[in-house]
Amino acid sequence: LSRFHFMYRKRIWNEKENSYLGWERKRGMLNQFNEYLLGHELNPFRENTIKEEIQKEETITLPKFKYIITLDADTDLILNSALELIGAMAHILNTPVVDPKKNVVVEGYGIMQPRVGVNLDISYQTLFTQIFAGAGGIDSYTNAISDIYQDNFQEGIFTGKGIYNLEVFSKVLRNAIPENTVLSHDLLEGNYLRCGLASDVVLMDGYPTKYNSFMTRLTRWIRGDWQII
């Protein structure tokens, strides 16, 4: 199977949104992607180069996947960060244990969140980012840092960029959240799967370059957070 593939979801009518969009937005995309890779669901995508390649080459089959790394469009992996995330998830002390009655992870971690910095070029792009984005780029002496949630509760806060165990994610979250009920799904997923903070692994992220775009993003985040309280 080739290393790079492209998938594009079908849009369906959503009565509450009064528009055509991908089922359950990003949360639905992850669920459908997971179920497809695990063989639990037929192709839910409008464009799927994996399916096309398998159909062309009879000797090619869909391999088994253990971990998925999720990134936003403006998030960059840096040298060895993917390998370090995989190593952290594969550590025996981090192996997720699912409670059969509650169907949530009670030991180990089903998902891990790295530390996220700001791209160097973005941090100096405008006067706004120079003031609010902080020091961008990579610290040459990067190491583990303290985090109040991880230190006190042995769990971090998942913000949508990280790595998760594919089978555990599917088992715990496949039918856990009703449709059209949440806007911000990252916090919920982290709570169900038990999120661990890998503060010694760093990803580089973008940053809004203008006040208007910053406030639009902040408003969306606040709406999502209030909705799940």
Where is each model-derived feature located?
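Internal catalytic domains of large membrane-associated glycosyltransferases
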Residues: 1-229
